[in-house]
Amino acid sequence: MADEEAGGTERMEISAELPQTPQRLASWWDQQVDFYTAFLHHLAQLVPEIYFAEMDPDLEKQEESVQMSIFTPLEWYLFGEDPDICLEKLKHSGAFQLCGRVFKSGETTYSCRDCAIDPTCVLCMDCFQDSVHKNHRYKMHTSTGGGFCDCGDTEAWKTGPFCVNHEPGRAGTIKENSRCPLNEEVIVQARKIFPSVIKYVVEMTIWEEEKELPPELQIREKNERYYCVLFNDEHHSYDHVIYSLQRALDCELAEAQLHTTAIDKEGRRAVKAGAYAACQEAKEDIKSHSENVSQHPLHVEVLHSEIMAHQKFALRLGSWMNKIMSYSSDFRQIFCQACLREEPDSENPCLISRLMLWDAKLYKGARKILHELIFSSFFMEMEYKKLFAMEFVKYYKQLQKEYISDDHDRSISITALSVQMFTVPTLARHLIEEQNVISVITETLLEVLPEYLDRNNKFNFQGYSQDKLGRVYAVICDLKYILISKPTIWTERLRMQFLEGFRSFLKILTCMQGMEEIRRQVGQHIEVDPDWEAAIAIQMQLKNILLMFQEWCACDEELLLVAYKECHKAVMRCSTSFISSSKTVVQSCGHSLETKSYRVSEDLVSIHLPLSRTLAGLHVRLSRLGAVSRLHEFVSFEDFQVEVLVEYPLRCLVLVAQVVAEMWRRNGLSLISQVFYYQDVKCREEMYDKDIIMLQIGASLMDPNKFLLLVLQRYELAEAFNKTISTKDQDLIKQYNTLIEEMLQVLIYIVGERYVPGVGNVTKEEVTMREIIHLLCIEPMPHSAIAKNLPENENNETGLENVINKVATFKKPGVSGHGVYELKDESLKDFNMYFYHYSKTQHSKAEHMQKKRRKQENKDEALPPPPPPEFCPAFSKVINLLNCDIMMYILRTVFERAIDTDSNLWTEGMLQMAFHILALGLLEEKQQLQKAPEEEVTFDFYHKASRLGSSAMNIQMLLEKLKGIPQLEGQKDMITWILQMFDTVKRLREKSCLIVATTSGSESIKNDEITHDKEKAERKRKAEAARLHRQKIMAQMSALQKNFIETHKLMYDNTSEMPGKEDSIMEEESTPAVSDYSRIALGPKRGPSVTEKEVLTCILCQEEQEVKIENNAMVLSACVQKSTALTQHRGKPIELSGEALDPLFMDPDLAYGTYTGSCGHVMHAVCWQKYFEAVQLSSQQRIHVDLFDLESGEYLCPLCKSLCNTVIPIIPLQPQKINSENADALAQLLTLARWIQTVLARISGYNIRHAKGENPIPIFFNQGMGDSTLEFHSILSFGVESSIKYSNSIKEMVILFATTIYRIGLKVPPDERDPRVPMLTWSTCAFTIQAIENLLGDEGKPLFGALQNRQHNGLKALMQFAVAQRITCPQVLIQKHLVRLLSVVLPNIKSEDTPCLLSIDLFHVLVGAVLAFPSLYWDDPVDLQPSSVSSSYNHLYLFHLITMAHMLQILLTVDTGLPLAQVQEDSEEAHSASSFFAEISQYTSGSIGCDIPGWYLWVSLKNGITPYLRCAALFFHYLLGVTPPEELHTNSAEGEYSALCSYLSLPTNLFLLFQEYWDTVRPLLQRWCADPALLNCLKQKNTVVRYPRKRNSLIELPDDYSCLLNQASHFRCPRSADDERKHPVLCLFCGAILCSQNICCQEIVNGEEVGACIFHALHCGAGVCIFLKIRECRVVLVEGKARGCAYPAPYLDEYGETDPGLKRGNPLHLSRERYRKLHLVWQQHCIIEEIARSQETNQMLFGFNWQLL
């Protein structure tokens, strides 16, 4: 590519005709008559030269050239003097009061729920932080890009429109309309320059020619250089484009990726340069290759190099204009004027309109810059914003059509600017009045959807394009924006234009009324489910718009009546087929109704009735205004035809009933989904609720008997009630019963649901409270669940916060879960079992919960309806449904069928509903009688329910009979309540006046209460008797249990573990009394090993087996992992592969360790192998993403599903007992000096033996060791025994586990013969113990009293495995490793690579030395090991030597800069410390100061050595089985130290060790301290590790989440200069912010591409890490390259809930408890486990590509 570029036409020199300096050029321009021509001439000469190298540009040089030769002269010409000085003056002349920041994609925006006019009013981060809204109920969201900060816009905020920086009165701030201090000359120059600049920018941006420039720019000799330019589209994926480029251009992957990234970012890129023919060929190749992978070819053009240059510069010139306009309002106004000016002799529109109309054809980069120009000019000046909006509306239809045909995102379309104009209240009014914008938008909708209209002119979205329809929603959104602020003042013109828009909107609703009609499928099931999503989605989009239109209409009574008339007309027009069709007559109880012969089960029916529902909404608002009485003025009674209005909503409710009755099951899932959404919170407000209201309107205006006849007819139940149906078809009976239930339920809703302002006398707050009460009657709920179940208004508000505390109390969350609201007891009285927003499941659950609660409170289980509020006058006649003849007949029929034992045409649910209707009628009559004299009450429900009439029994008598039916025991309480209510109403009826009636009513109520009290007392007595009976039985069971335990006491004494004790275990396992033995682990006084018979059960085959060394192996499932949990230097460079690594010595900073954890579940080795093979086989057959890496030996524990990658063989502890006489005798002989001499003699002997071999032990001895070789066998004289013989099965498992540790610890292929295998075994033992000790210390738990079962079992198995592992290796190898370890602590021996004392972790040395030491007893002919007494001394002296070395480590690195606050008194330990420190100070040649107080040294030593002692105690306990002192099971810091010393055979004054061994240790001290490497370490104090090591924790996070967002907003990608959307991710281990999921920051690891987070995790956490995605508030756990999972973030809102993705946007604050839990997941090494568990529960066919995170 570079060669081709260089081979093009030679660059032209800048013309000598033009002046060379900016000042002279400015002067020359001033002398020209026509600036535009002169300017273009200048550009024609320079631009192609500057932007010559398009393929590989030198961006810095380009910018420098364009600045010097074009922008600086322009600025000189504009200001007439040095532009830098002028711009600086303008900069300091004051900040503009409008912020105007344009949001980038991914940027955080803030809105205030208290003050914003609507949710589109947002602030940028900086303005928000300095505003009053920070302390309000704000919301945080992530911008999709292209938005605008509204700080300073007084129309956007109710209060606090300005932040501190943009406050008008503040010094340095200027008002919107004030003028910057520009002199007239500058303004004149601007009027010359700006039109020319804008015209050039527009002309070049929309230039279509590929080969030729405009004539005025063709002054150079034309070259033959072209570019093949590839454009971005949304049809092709990244990979498609890369593939096409690789094939067409024959280029490398990296080059293709570079091109693709640039195309995605900028929208286009030159991918080839050269002659026209070559570029044309490349174009055709790219198109053909891209067609192979997609139906659409890529958009490619061949452009002349000069066209490319000018187009690129035009955009750069646009950015320059942006900069200039930011300095002055005058500049902005001149720019706007120039953009809006129409050319006199041209048919073209003004420049800004031309840009708008060309927007859809522009590429991404051009669009962005031009939109920014609009933001920084028109939108910063209110007057010109209005003019721009008028131009926008003028071309609105064309712009939207082009957007719908386009494939680019909405955020980079000119149509996205609508929100900036339509949501400004004054501007919206102006556009409605002057340009009829509502009609424009609605007409646009009709014009873009004609393809979806059927022959009846109704929408039918079958086979719709999801993408296209998704773009249509943008037009619907604009309608919402224009209506979002209701006008407070109505002018005649506004009223007229709004009505015009409303009529236009009704046309859309007419096309939706009855759309997508369906017919019941009979015979066979439908073959293909029809599309239903589009129609429901449009219904959802229109929900708030419908409500807003209704609210706008309700602002003005006249307007509302006219709108009602128009809507009524539209409904009638859609109902012509119903009006003209044939009729049928329905009769019952002497009443008849003539209606259309229509059956929902046979004829066409639609769920979409927006016109009818809008009319219902307008009717309710008429009722609210009290204007229903005027309705006849606009719609005559003859034309009203209420039956027609009721018809379609009633059909819809019948359809729902029949779906419930499974009559439509052959119509498939499509209908079920529609019915679900019809009643769901997202749609119900403008669907289901409005249908109920329309039926209430019908009931209020029709004769009640005729209304019920219509209902019976449509439910197809008229015959079911008129005659007894004799059928044995159980399905048909079930169908009838379901339909009757559904009908009764709807009747309950019509009569009882009055919580709609305008239907009942209620407020919006009362409606919301009732919704909340009924939700919380189901169960306590979190805030988000309540909000999710409440309908939102146009501002996305539910009204929840205003009322929730009146009806519920908040219960705070624990460490997991979320906070919930619980209903207050006083709100329970408002529970209505037949609440119309309950689903079937919710209804059942609520009924169950309330009955259960009443039972617990010893109350009856009756759940009568609460007294309903009064109907509004317009709906007052609805109650006549209750006492009409047909209703009484329906109720009587239901009760009679229930009494008839042969009848099966009733259900208990049906009876419940009938009782509910009875209760409603009685409550209504009772309320009326209590409010008015008896003679004024015409509602006679009691009379009609208690009269006999034509039947033998009245309803009251039927109830008495029902009460005695055993099957209805559950309804007895409700029947009792109704009968009592009958009695109450009867008494009220018997009184002749209101006062007496009220008194009588209260007396009857008192009688009711007495009856209730008696029943309550009876219930309480029964409950108490039952409780005593249970207590008696429990006591008998307890006595039997104790008797059994006493009888079988022996068995219980021998039980090793108490079942069910998961969280902690007791270490004393069937031990003798404390006085029986010594609790000392080391030396001659060592206590006995506590061992027991261990019988374990395999979780796979459930067979038991005793653990013995000669038996087949049993294993624990385990997971080995690399860990940085203890590191003292986070991010220390790591070798990704350990081919050359020597892991014998661990660095003291514990940078990378190998941790072994186990879930504690036991299997036979054979069973595990079979299980693993089965897992491998099933994994090969699965199509899901692999959950684990089988090649690495991974599997899920069969029981707990923890991720494992190996097994630990369970090897029993070999009992060891020391003969006290032998020990005492040996104590006299085996001093430390003698022991060292013996060990050195043995090593020396081995060295001589191997001297002739190939691999001698690489050591050298100090002088004086010559004779020691004669004592080669003397080590055996202190006690030996035969080595343990393990079964082959155990050996195999030992080798397998050791090889796994080696493979994972070093990241190398498995090799069981590698000499480093034993090193890794010792290392994982040491590191695992250190990690567990660190965790216990971090949690403040005792060393032995708080170990979890799995930790206890895992450590026990790990230590015994380590003992056995030595035997599976060549002993010569172990000896070599041992000698290297001993060279650190033995005075007369030093290996060539012996490390400096300060550069090793001595606990690792201790573990390695102890486990390797028995190898010294091995010799060729015999396989021996030390006896118990020998090993007790070996352990004691090794431990003492290494402890002294560690003491020296601590004292050499003591932190002298942090003395303790108070001076401690002198003590023996302090004196010892001072004198010892003075001694070693001499040995280090004064490298450490000796003026540190003794008490400080002693305290530092004690604190520093305690973790080491705790680790040693754990190690020796699990190695030897000696029970530790009781103090180590309790949480006592002071008692712990002395107990540790006692257990480990140490004096509490540790300096006594040196006194005891001084002669032996002194040479060693001198050698250690004189080591040059050690002295060098002491000089580099900043890198030295101090003790105790710091306990790692996750980074400190701010309490307020907005602080983190602020931090992220300032994040700049280290490898990318652009400000495109980034995904800043915070590492919670080290605090680094990374650029995630972006190609710019990908790295190559072992030939594979990995994202920035995965690459960081490899170094920071050895592949395991915790990240916080800042802009999404999501925690992500990752492990390795291909695994990860989401985890609840530690940030909660005030309701105790997380907010992943900031979807709710509530303020978030750090939960310390949650963050602590996350910290423990890390420190317990459970991250891998969490990931595996998450992946197991959330299996996906195609998982997230974690590798590129």
Swiss-Prot record:
Record GO biological process: cellular response to L-leucine; negative regulation of TOR signaling; proteasome-mediated ubiquitin-dependent protein catabolic process; protein ubiquitination; ubiquitin-dependent protein catabolic process via the N-end rule pathway
Keyword presence, Coiled coil: no
Effect of residue 136 to R: In JBS; prevents proper folding of the UBR-type zinc finger; may decrease protein stability; loss of activity in a yeast-based assay
Binding-site list for Zn(2+) 2: 99, 112, 115, 124, 127, 133, 136, 149
Enzyme Commission (EC) number: 2.3.2.27
Gene3D superfamilies (alphabetical): 2.10.110.30, 3.30.1390.10, E3 ubiquitin-protein ligase (1.10.10.2670)
Residues that hold Zn(2+) 1 according to the record: 99, 124, 127, 149, 151, 163
Binding-site list for Zn(2+) 4: 1098, 1101, 1164, 1167
Span list, region Disordered: 842-868
Sites where the protein binds a peptide: 148, 150, 153
Region entry UBC2-binding region (U2BR), spans: 1019-1054
Residues that bear Phosphothreonine: 21
Record GO cellular component, one term: cytoplasm
Record keywords: Acetylation, Cytoplasm, Disease variant, Metal-binding, Phosphoprotein, Transferase, Ubl conjugation pathway, Zinc, Zinc-finger
Regulation: Inhibited by the small-molecule compound RF-C11, which bears two heterovalent ligands: RF-C11 inhibits activity toward both type-1 and type-2 N-degrons.
Zn finger (UBR-type) start-end: 97-168
Top-level taxon: Eukaryota
Chain positions with N-acetylalanine modification: 2
Family of this protein: Belongs to the E3 ubiquitin-protein ligase UBR1-like family.
Assembly information from the UniProt record: Interacts with RECQL4.
Name of the protein described by the UniProt record: E3 ubiquitin-protein ligase UBR1
Species assigned in the record: Homo sapiens
Gene this chain is encoded by: UBR1
